[in-house]
Amino acid sequence: MARQHKLEDYRNIGIMAHIDAGKTTTTERILLHTGKIHKIGETHDGASQMDWMAQEQERGITITSAATTAFWKGKRINIIDTPGHVDFTVEVERSLRVLDGAVTVLDAQSGVEPQTETVWRQATTYRVPRLIYVNKMDKAGADFFASVKSVKTRLNANAVAIQIPIGQESDFKGIVDLVEMKAYEYDGKPEENAKEIEIPFDLQALAKEKRQELIEAVATYDEEFMMKVLDGVEPTLDELKAMIRKATLTSEFFPAVCGTSFKNKGVKKMIDAVVDYLPSPLDIPAAKAHKGENEEVDVPATDDYPFTGLAFKVMTDPFVGSLTFIRLYAGTLQKGSYVYNSTKGTKERIGRLILMHANSRSEIDEANAGDIVAAVGLKGTTTGDTLIAEKAPEIVLERMVFPEPVISQALEPESKDAMEKLALGLQKLAAEDPTFRTYTDEETGQTIIAGMGELHLDIIVDRLKREHGVKAKVGAPQVSYRETITKSADVEGKHIKQSGGKGQYGHVWIKFEPNPDKGFEFVDKIVGGKIPKEYIKPIQKGLEDKMASGILAGYPMIDIKATLFDGSYHDVDSSELAYKIAASKALTKAKDLVGTVLLEPIMDVSVIIPDDYYGDVMGDITRRRGQIQESELRNDGDHILRCLTPLSEMFGYATDLRSMTAGRGNYQMQFHHYEKCPKNIADEIIKKRNIQLKDED
């Protein structure tokens, strides 16, 4: 099937922002203007097109990234609407991994907010070119220039206005386009009719000044253009647009526009900017892939290269079952074809191919390079897997890295009969979300769920009830502590039983070393066949199993390097099980030799409070072992306090903050890092945990 849109006409973009900045409403307006929907749904009414899960419509927040395809002025725009709540940053992360450009939505009153910083950092990691849309210009306290300035000061990013507002707050009427040097006034109707007017007299000097700033800012990205500017030559419209595009594609220059999506002002101009300045798949560096152990290869964005795609999201659809979202980096993909999962080394069949619009869909026969599609029928593919043409040279795209869960809860179904349904439901939810884990506590037999925050787990439990018909009782949230080692030691592990009948013989020497931030690393240095090859994997597995249950207080162990360097075997009595047990015994024995310590999750907390309550809240954070990182007074008179605080001290904080600030304070929290627990606190936790484990025995 012939390609319907040239690759240079594609725009794969994400809409990202802090919670409540108006992302979903903005996406709704884009869909309205591009002809995708005919009736507007409002987030605050629970009727938004992109927020299609029941929980999203009830809570008025976006949880999963809904994908949709729209068309504007001959361009094909694939849009991902991402959540702004910190418990769902995995959705932002995996979207940015497969997008080419993004629109960052700011609230005109607040400018850059805590979660804006998080998503901006994520986008910077993937070098995603961005356009800034300052929304809610009609809101009390709205200030376009202060919002743009906050991008420069808070994000250290070169944001430059390409529009200025005509009026603000309730007087916001339209915009002056600094590229065209024309003014537009909006009628506020859903069609967003714009009337060209004279640039208001009181804005003419400011418009000239800001246009000159824009020209000088983009001139630094092109020497020839800069020489013209220095010679006083006025750029043509096409020249200036080309220069803004060139600067934006560097991911170092960020054009800023403004509007109010809810009041239908400025969105069409923002879509024009998406088309004019954000990249096509041909404008960004080719995707990198690994071939074999050490070779890195480029995957060119073309239909002529063998099919290469990344599975960036898996979700369960009530009508078609499992849907796997794929970004095609190269080649073509047909429904009914076989592909190779090079991450897992398995073959998969593409049953059907679907173009998604929030939760409605249309089937297609073929997808091309640059497309974002959903495939039905994949059995073993999970988030982050590379899919390639069946007989193509084997390559693997760079994997996505997801944070470890920091909070857990015990879960049990209200009836024993529902155990099987519960296990199946949890398995499906874990396949969709890489930051959600579920396992059975071997000591208690309880089902444990673990995730990125209380809201994350609330929604998991809610989805179990709605989608899988399982009502469950939930225990109190628990901190997910970790254990690690701080010293190196050579440790012997033996499992030898040789009295009568077939015996058991496993004998290892393992060097344990700290491995900060690198997870578990196993190195085989056995030479001369001292331990036969077939027992090496069981030794590694024995260590991994023991690490999962810990050696200090029953918490999982992280960041350890284990080097197997010596040992012995018995011709008759050695077995996989014996070596597994020997390795486990070595790690248990190492407890006092390697300086085993307890680690606690430290959270990045941003608290927004009126000035009157600053002292009380600051004192409370200090009492919670919080370390203040930054304090800033915003334009609206509120303070933002950023601090690093142990998760164990933050349970119930929402209620405490409400009571301290008469309901006027709010906060956001996300995992930052694991840190050694202070000895007095660690001793108390270990003591309680060991009593608990003893009682359960």
From Swiss-Prot:
**For GTP, which residues are the binding ones?**
17-24, 81-85, 135-138
- Bilayer-crossing regions: none
Q: Where is the tr-type G domain?
A: 8-282
Q: Which UniProt keywords apply?
A: Cytoplasm, Elongation factor, GTP-binding, Nucleotide-binding, Protein biosynthesis
Q: Name one GO cellular component term.
A: cytoplasm
Annotated GO biological processes are: ribosome disassembly
Gene3D superfamilies the record matches: 3.30.230.10, 3.30.70.240, Elongation Factor G (Translational Gtpase), domain 3 (3.30.70.870), P-loop containing nucleotide triphosphate hydrolases (3.40.50.300), Translation factors (2.40.30.10)
- UniProt-annotated location(s): Cytoplasm
Q: Where is the signal peptide?
A: none
GO MF term set: GTP binding; GTPase activity; translation elongation factor activity
InterPro entries for the chain: EF-G-like_DII, EFG_II, EFG_III, EFG_III/V, EFG_IV, EFG_V, EFG_V-like, G_TR_CS
Pfam family for this entry, one = EF-G_D2
The record's function comment reads: Catalyzes the GTP-dependent ribosomal translocation step during translation elongation. During this step, the ribosome changes from the pre-translocational (PRE) to the post-translocational (POST) state as the newly formed A-site-bound peptidyl-tRNA and P-site-bound deacylated tRNA move to the P and E sites, respectively. Catalyzes the coordinated movement of the two tRNA molecules, the mRNA and conformational changes in the ribosome.
Question: Entry's PANTHER family?
Answer: RIBOSOME-RELEASING FACTOR 2, MITOCHONDRIAL, TRANSLATION ELONGATION FACTOR G-RELATED
Similarity-based family: Belongs to the TRAFAC class translation factor GTPase superfamily. Classic translation factor GTPase family. EF-G/EF-2 subfamily.
What is the protein name stated in its UniProt record? Elongation factor G
